[in-house]
């Protein structure tokens, strides 16, 4: 992975003239701005809610606008269109309108019937969230995972998994978070690994958790 050294690296960089990035987070802003810097004539953010609901930081959105990013808000992707050669030539979209707030507290997007249109692009970049690689659970049956597919650990203070000698930390445990938290998890796991190599002790994932202490009585 040496693309950062281009042009002194053999790592290929894909360049496109019309790029659509589906999503509204910080990574989506990074992707669409990078597309412009690589020479795209048009770079779009396709987002199904309004500008006020964009989850990206305000400064990210402002900087993207200053660089020339075009925002296709209240727009949901329907399907990617390809030509006979198998290359992307368009993105079919549907106009949306905002209804009542959903469980996240943001107003729920509702499709407008008959509002389909095609955005002419030659590249579509999905940026709609992150998740754990399902291969982890499929190939490691003797390790426990959470309902969302993340690795279960004793605690973030040790990073000890249910598989003896295996430690985990960062996004694969907490879900998408920050580099600082991941670095902290690595440091904590490093100390736990050092202890394990010295004494060989491991925790029992099946041991009952200690009961929480009852609250102290209030003395009047």
What is the predicted function of each stretch?
Residues 1-16, 101-176:
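FAD-site-proximal beta/loop scaffold in flavoenzymes
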Residues 5-40:
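Rossmann-like NAD(P)H-binding beta-loop-alpha module
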Residues 24, 47-50, 171:
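Cofactor-binding loop segments of dinucleotide-utilizing enzymes, especially the Rossmann-like FAD-
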Residues 31, 172-203:
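A conserved FAD-binding loop/helix module that cradles the flavin
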Residues 32-79, 201-219:
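Rossmann-like dinucleotide-binding cores of NAD(P)H-dependent redox enzymes
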Residues 70-72, 92, 167:
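General small-molecule cofactor/ligand-binding pocket signal
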Residues 74-87, 95-100:
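A conserved short coil-to-beta-strand element within the FAD-binding core of flavoproteins
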């Amino acid at each position: 992975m040496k693309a950062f050294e281009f042009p002194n690296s053999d790592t290929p960089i894909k360049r496109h003239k019309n790029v659509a990035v589906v999503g509204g987070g910080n990574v989506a802003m990074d992707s669409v701005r990078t597309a412009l810097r690589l020479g795209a004539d048009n770079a779009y953010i396709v987002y199904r809610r309004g500008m006020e609901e964009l989850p990206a930081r305000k400064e990210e959105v402002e900087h993207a606008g200053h660089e020339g990013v075009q925002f296709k808000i209240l727009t949901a992707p329907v399907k990617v269109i390809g030509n006979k050669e198998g290359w992307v030539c368009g993105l079919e979209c549907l106009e949306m309108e905002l209804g009542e707030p959903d469980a996240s507290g943001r107003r729920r997007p509702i499709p407008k019937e008959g509002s389909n249109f095609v955005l002419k692009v030659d590249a579509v970049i999905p940026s709609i969230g992150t998740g754990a690689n399902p291969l982890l659970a499929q190939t490691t049956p003797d390790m426990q995972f959470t309902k969302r597919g993340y690795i279960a650990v004793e605690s973030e203070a040790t990073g000890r998994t249910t598989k003896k000698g295996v430690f985990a930390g960062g996004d694969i445990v907490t879900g998408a978070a920050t580099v600082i938290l991941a670095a902290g998890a690595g440091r904590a796991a490093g100390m736990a690994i050092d202890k394990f190599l010295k004494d060989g002790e491991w925790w029992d994932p099946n041991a009952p958790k200690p009961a929480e202490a009852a609250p102290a009585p209030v003395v009047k």
